[in-house]
Amino acid sequence: MSKIGNRSIKIDPSKVSLMQTTTLLTIKGPLGENTIKLPKNLPLKFVVENDTIKVTNNNNLKQTKILHGTFNALVNNAVIGVTKGFEKKLILVGVGYRANVEGQFLNLQLGYSHPIKELIPNQLTVKVEKNTEITISGIKKELVGQFATEIRKWRKPEPYKGKGVLYFNEVIVRKQGKTAEGKK
């Protein structure tokens, strides 16, 4: 049996509702609605009992065990997303590194000769504080992480000076540069 698949997911029935069709699982909550696509002939059942959701499997095939844990994690992330939401913070470290939001675009100045414009997905909200702190929030964990990674890829942190786009509380292991010793 799958350890992750056997975990029960706690919900507040007054806030969260679950609807299942043959191809979609829809979870509604106070922050919005998350849908999970289900493969055809999925041998799993999603049962709501009191204040928990249980994902149960019908057989002991290897593929079913794999899907059991995966879909339990996906449903758990969807429930957390529609109740609390997800958030990632990025920090710009470097001389002249700035960010601002203009309409649907996030403008970044990261030391290149041109500003970088990233289109903000509809399901996300992006806030910029102090021109160097970017907060990305939304109800889909995957989308929040993906957009944060897209921003970070423009200037990954480098180990010598520590400049770049960092996740909040990320520790960059610094390297010592070459030192010029006296010539003999």
From Swiss-Prot:
Q: Which GO terms describe its cellular component?
A: cytosolic large ribosomal subunit
InterPro entries per UniProt = Ribosomal_uL6-like, Ribosomal_uL6-like_a/b-dom_sf, Ribosomal_uL6_a/b-dom, Ribosomal_uL6_bac-type, Ribosomal_uL6_CS
Q: Show the GO MF annotations.
A: rRNA binding; structural constituent of ribosome
Q: Does the keyword Ion transport apply?
A: no
**Which sequence ranges form a coiled-coil region, renumbered to this chain?**
none
Swiss-Prot/TrEMBL keywords: Ribonucleoprotein, Ribosomal protein, RNA-binding, rRNA-binding
Q: Looking at the record's lineage, which domain of life comes first?
A: Bacteria
Q: Which GO terms describe its biological process?
A: cytoplasmic translation
HAMAP family according to UniProt: Ribosomal_uL6_B (MF_01365_B)
Instruction: Identify its protein family.
Output: Belongs to the universal ribosomal protein uL6 family.
Q: What does this protein do?
A: This protein binds to the 23S rRNA, and is important in its secondary structure. It is located near the subunit interface in the base of the L7/L12 stalk, and near the tRNA binding site of the peptidyltransferase center.
PANTHER family referenced in this protein's UniProt entry, alphabetically: 60S/50S RIBOSOMAL PROTEIN L6/L9 (PTHR11655), LARGE RIBOSOMAL SUBUNIT PROTEIN UL6M (PTHR11655:SF14)
- Oligomeric form and interacting partners: Part of the 50S ribosomal subunit.
Name of the protein in question: Large ribosomal subunit protein uL6
Native species: Mycoplasma genitalium (strain ATCC 33530 / DSM 19775 / NCTC 10195 / G37)
Its gene name is: rplF
